[in-house]
């Protein structure tokens, strides 16, 4: 019964997520690269973003029943906006803000729950990240797979909305740790060398 409404909501959410990417292109991090990225500052950024995400998620989960359900998509978009800015700030501290693509943003946001979705476009090793060029169709396929993941998340949140206080604690805690995982993924990713497939082919041909 919940699948069809949730699928519709996830489609609307994906449209909102794509709009967020346009906003991220205009976002300029206030942080500048250093010779060695300051570990304390990175941890502070992740911690602050995690608390902010948790607070927003918990607050949006307080209204009970149908009113609370209406707040699910705005909540998700606000949390992903916080996480997206966190990714950009971490990239800036590593001096790699200009290398952030929509593929890398999605990878940081969803790797901990769906690394397999990115198998065709991102290859990660211990020391480097390789980004393969994507067609519109490939990127659309990735979004469709993420849509399934998001639908499951929306269904869980729907149940939580019927238990206002307990549900708020659960969703707030989940958003907190989810943002921490996103931050840790971004720190691990941007500490590596980032290459595109075109660059690799050029180097191999020399």
Label each PLM-derived region with a short phrase:
Residues 1-62, 81-206:
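Terminal, membrane-proximal amphipathic helices
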Residues 69-78, 174:
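Selective recognition of hydrophobic, aromatic-rich stretches within alpha-helical transmembrane segments
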């Amino acid at each position: 019964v919940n699948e069809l409404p949730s699928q519709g909501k996830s489609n609307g959410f994906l449209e909102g997520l794509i709009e967020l990417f346009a906003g991220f292109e205009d976002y300029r991090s206030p942080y500048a690269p250093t010779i060695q990225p300051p570990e304390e500052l990175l941890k502070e950024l992740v911690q602050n973003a995690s608390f902010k995400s948790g607070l927003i998620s918990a607050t949006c989960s307080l209204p009970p029943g149908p009113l609370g359900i209406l707040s699910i998509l705005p909540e998700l978009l606000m949390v992903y906006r916080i996480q997206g800015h966190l990714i950009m700030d971490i990239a800036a501290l590593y001096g790699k803000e200009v290398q952030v693509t929509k593929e890398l943003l999605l990878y940081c946001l969803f790797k901990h729950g769906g690394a397999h979705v990115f198998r065709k476009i991102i290859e990660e090793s211990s020391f480097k990240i390789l980004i393969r060029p994507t067609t519109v169709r490939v990127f659309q396929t990735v979004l469709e797979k993420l849509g399934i993941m998001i639908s499951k998340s929306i269904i869980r949140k729907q149940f939580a909305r019927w238990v206002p206080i307990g549900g708020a604690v659960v969703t707030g805690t989940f958003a907190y740790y989810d943002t921490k995982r996103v931050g840790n993924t971004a720190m691990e990713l941007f500490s590596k060398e980032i290459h595109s497939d075109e660059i690799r082919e050029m180097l191999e041909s020399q």
